Amino acid sequence: MRNQILDCINNRVSLRTYDDRPITDEELQAVLEAAMHAPTAGNQMLYSIIVIRNQETKEKLSKSCDNQPFIAKAPVLLLFVADQHKWFDFYKKNGVKEFCEEQKEKGYCFEAPQESDLILAAEDTMIAAQNAVIAAESLGIGSCYIGDIVENYEYHQKLFELPEYVFPISLLCLGHYKPNHNRVFRKRFDPKFVVFEEKYHQLSDEEYDEMFEEECKKYRQDNPYKAHNYAQMFYARKTGAAFSKEMARSFRVALK
């Protein structure tokens, strides 16, 4: 089955080289409006979006986000932050803490945002970000997610003057495709390894071998990690890498 929306989703690729054409205010507004129409828990909209066009700020982010120069070349960056600050400010200004103390026999207890609150806000944030991605794509504007914004929490908190209960979730680079841009599509896992009916399916060793057959072809014996197979190489490059540890550290700091 095909339609314009499905084609837009399925033809989208991460874009790291951008045309010289600027993103117009009208285009940007359309993207932001689409983001804000994303599904949200209880209509709380537990996120904020910071529009970044200042070149100096983009240069700083290109370094703090794992030294990726293309970030500075994107016409517009959108920083999506999980935001419990606004609601908890609203609670404080309207005596919610005092209300909880008055009604404590009913089980009310006013607390700062918990881990689950950050997860819920992160869900809202990423749904909004993906709406922005699809809206931009429909306008001929490419995008690239930068997960490294989760790193270096203290630096980014200061750079963007983030108050308590606000945490960077994703940085989105936006820019027009260059004429005749060659879209390179990366193969996804077979749906049978991702989509399960009714309950989770634990893969067998044989199924894991089949699932990762194409990925394992990327293994190189001369890899810099001295890994003996693809799984070891990928873990060293991604899951167990220093940037991943820094993400975890930043996350823990934000929760304090």
Role assignments for model-derived ranges:
Residues 1-256:
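Acidic, surface-exposed loops and disordered segments
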